[in-house]
């Protein structure tokens, strides 16, 4: 990977080999960032590109001219950006370059392939959003399943969420977000699959700022999608949501009409459509529509209905229900992670271009029934206590859906392993053991608070200078804007 140079340090003059999409993305980010790299020339064996400019950088000729061009341009480092090249082609290019004695980087990391060690099974799985509620759980399961894992995440609340996993020899961590093309390119190098969990999650968080939601849930997904396609990474797993079904009186499945009632759901549908349209010979996406998640994770959340009810019952002795008749499909966070691994392990032709609802038919429940269940479990486990339930059925929550999970069960043999009572008891035990350092209502455990922190950064001048966003070009905002 690239060695970062401090801001203000003299820029290193870089010659880029390759003029395709991957190299173009990298050149754009080099020019935009303060990493200390200055692309001054490009080599490509396509004669029609000779003399053309890419982001203002000239294509000087074929790769065999590397010695002559490097000398003429005072090159200090060479970057090979041809992910589609064969091993023989790369070996020839590397041979030209190594004779110069200059530092040489290859995008993606094909070094292991040239050494005969780059088997598919040991190439990393990239988890975008690997520091989140689901991501931290998934990373642990992948590592335990002998995968090499690379995490790409903003870590808004700090990298402590990974805990002892950071010391695992098969884990690599890159801190940043998808719209930083330089860091994204590093994160994608030599990946065998990409699991996209990042973005603003949930209706409340996504309703804070429309531009913010569109950037992180739509624009950033497009950037990631185009980069994955350019690098010919075959497997792409996208985390969608059963909230795309909105309000429905019928039990819905993957073929049912979508009825979004929030910007969050609309953003998921937009990304689903774009991803599936991009499927092809070298790109095999899978869409996973998650049920509402519950359970303990390294990156805890108490803005999820089951976790919130459990914390209220345990700490306050009462549960407040805002609308009791709506149906929700539920699934434990560890089962979500297991479903992703199940897709990753499946033959690619079995999951390519497929949409799966992820949950279990036995875990469809109304909010009112859930509150009663939580109260009963916590009441029973806390001897001598009584949990009260307050219901406000005047609350207008248009989300109401029961979901069929027959397809994922029949296709991949997936069923939830952890039931509601066990998950509730797990959360209550963690609360009793003092696992969570702050009260359940602390902003640390809420995606709304995380979104507010990201919003401040999003509108800053520094973010605009180092991240790609079509939206930011059109927004006329003060650089020191703060959250209202």
How would you describe each model-predicted region?
Residues 113, 203-204, 238-251, 263-269, ...:
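Conserved catalytic-site region of short-chain dehydrogenase/reductase
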Residues 241, 272-297, 307:
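Conserved beta-loop-beta element that borders a ligand/cofactor-binding pocket
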Residues 321-484:
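C-terminal substrate-binding subdomain of Rossmann-fold SDR/epimerase-dehydratase oxidoreductases
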Residues 247, 259-286, 314-315:
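Active-site Tyr-X1-5-Lys
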């Amino acid at each position: 990977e690239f060695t970062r140079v401090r801001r203000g340090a003299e820029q290193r003059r870089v010659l880029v080999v390759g003029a395709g999409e991957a190299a173009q993305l990298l050149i754009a980010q080099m020019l935009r960032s303060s990493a200390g790299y200055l692309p001054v020339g490009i080599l490509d064996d396509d004669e029609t590109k000779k003399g053309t400019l890419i982001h203002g950088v000239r294509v000087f000729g074929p790769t065999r001219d590397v010695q002559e061009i490097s000398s003429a341009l005072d090159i200090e480092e060479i970057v090979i950006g041809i992910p589609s090249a064969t091993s023989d082609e790369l070996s020839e290019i590397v041979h030209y370059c190594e004779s110069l004695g200059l530092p040489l980087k290859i995008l993606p990391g094909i070094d292991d392939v040239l050494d005969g060690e780059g088997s598919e099974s040991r190439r990393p799985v990239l988890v975008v959003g690997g520091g989140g509620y689901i991501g931290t759980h998934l990373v642990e399961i992948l590592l335990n399943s002998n995968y090499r894992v690379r995490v790409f995440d903003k870590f808004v609340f700090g990298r402590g969420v990974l805990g002892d996993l950071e010391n695992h020899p098969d884990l690599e961590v890159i801190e940043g977000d998808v719209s930083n093309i330089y860091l994204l390119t590093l994160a994608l190098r030599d990946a065998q699959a990409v699991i996209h969990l990042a973005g603003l999650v949930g209706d409340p968080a996504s309703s804070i700022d429309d531009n913010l939601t569109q950037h992180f849930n739509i624009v950033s997904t497009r950037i990631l999608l185009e980069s994955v396609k350019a690098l010919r990474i075959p497997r792409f797993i996208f985390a969608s949501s059963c909230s795309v079904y909105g309000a429905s009186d019928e039990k819905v499945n993957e073929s049912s009409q979508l009825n979004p009632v929030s910007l969050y759901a609309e953003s998921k549908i937009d990304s689903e459509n774009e991803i599936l349209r991009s499927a092809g010979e070298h790109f095999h996406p899978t869409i996973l529509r998650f049920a509402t998640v519950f359970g303990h994770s390294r990156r805890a959340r108490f803005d999820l209905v089951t976790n919130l009810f459990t914390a209220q019952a345990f700490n306050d002795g009462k549960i407040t229900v805002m609308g009791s008749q709506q149906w929700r499909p539920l699934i434990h966070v560890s089962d979500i992670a297991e479903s992703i691994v199940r897709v990753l392990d499946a033959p690619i032709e079995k999951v390519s271009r497929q949409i799966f609802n992820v949950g279990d038919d036995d875990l469809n429940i109304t909010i009112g029934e859930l509150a009663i269940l939580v109260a009963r479990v916590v009441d029973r486990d806390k001897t001598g206590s009584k949990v009260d339930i307050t219901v406000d059925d005047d609350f207008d929550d248009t989300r109401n859906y029961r979901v069929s999970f027959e397809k994922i069960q029949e296709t991949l043999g997936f069923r939830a392993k952890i039931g509601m009572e066990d998950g509730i008891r797990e959360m209550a035990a963690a609360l009793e053991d003092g696992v969570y350092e702050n009260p359940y209502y602390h902003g640390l455990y809420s995606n709304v608070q995380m979104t507010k922190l990201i919003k401040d950064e999003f509108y800053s001048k520094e973010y605009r200078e180092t991240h790609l966003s079509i939206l930011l070009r059109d927004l006329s905002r003060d650089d020191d804007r703060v959250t209202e």
